[in-house]
UniProtKB/Swiss-Prot annotation:
Protein name as catalogued: Sucrose operon repressor
Residue span, HTH lacI-type domain: 1-55
PROSITE patterns with a match to the protein in the record: HTH_LACI_1, HTH_LACI_2
Domain of life: Bacteria
Key words, A-Z: DNA-binding, Repressor, Transcription, Transcription regulation
Annotated function: Negative regulator of scrB expression.
Amino acid sequence: MKNIADIAKIAGVSKSTVSRYLNNGSVSLKTQQKLDEIIRENDYQPNQFAQSLRARRTNMIGAIIPRMNSFAVDETIKGVKTVCDQLNYSLLLNYTNLNIQLEIDALETFYRSKVDGIVFMATEITDQHLEVINKINVPVIIVGQAHDDLHCIIHNDYQAGYLVGDMLGQQGYNDIKFFGVTESDIAVGVQRKEGLIAGLEAHNIQPEISLTSFNYQEAMVDVVEALQAYPHYDAIVGATDSIALAIHKYNSEHKPHAHEKYIVGFGGDPVTDIVSPSIHTINYNFEYAGSVAMDKLNQMIQHQVIEQRIIIDVEQSFEN
């Protein structure tokens, strides 16, 4: 009878990859399909005792969150929690403050706590993350970032950026400032920015770009410096609603005709509609993304094959 080493040799993968597959850990869809076929053809039967040890489920789900007091995080976790309640899972949260080492620690802590699965709201995926996720043999689903070797739920950030760029071009805005974030965050720092640039280029417009932080207070410092140096933009775009709120605050306090500035953010935070004049924003379906993530994670826990990547579209909530 074939053993794990035999299956690994036939598949051309490591024994640890086969072990992750058998324990419903994180392997690519292509590898899952290959192992499905090989195991079926060879009538491989995993050690029942070993499987029974892993089958002792705790009905606990771990969620790793990057920020507190964030509309995006709150809404995503709301969606996760709704599905957890429906499926009788308890939800544990671990807050990491955008710190990679704390994220690594959280993954290992949840593994030691024997959670059935992990929802990871990532701002970037490094080799360190990948190494730990592959090692812990716990189903992990990523929300907010894409990686070819992991199961991911992502928002269509390129679409979001393009909608804003195209809308500004159609409206006749030409002198445009964009406050972006580091490209280590692929979704916001790369995809969203590239979409915006493409939307503007369709109208032969090039934005002036500065980098800032996700943190409101830190963004405020960068916004003040940039807009004091050149205050004459007719439209200003923040890569997030928090950055857009910092822009709004500066304009409200420093310019007597702040309403003449067209300010745009991303996320759909209700605060953007409360301030006056309101901030135009792209709505993200964060709660829905959270519910999809938890539903798919449950399928992984049940040893079902799921899509490698699911893209959630965004919505333009304001009129041109």
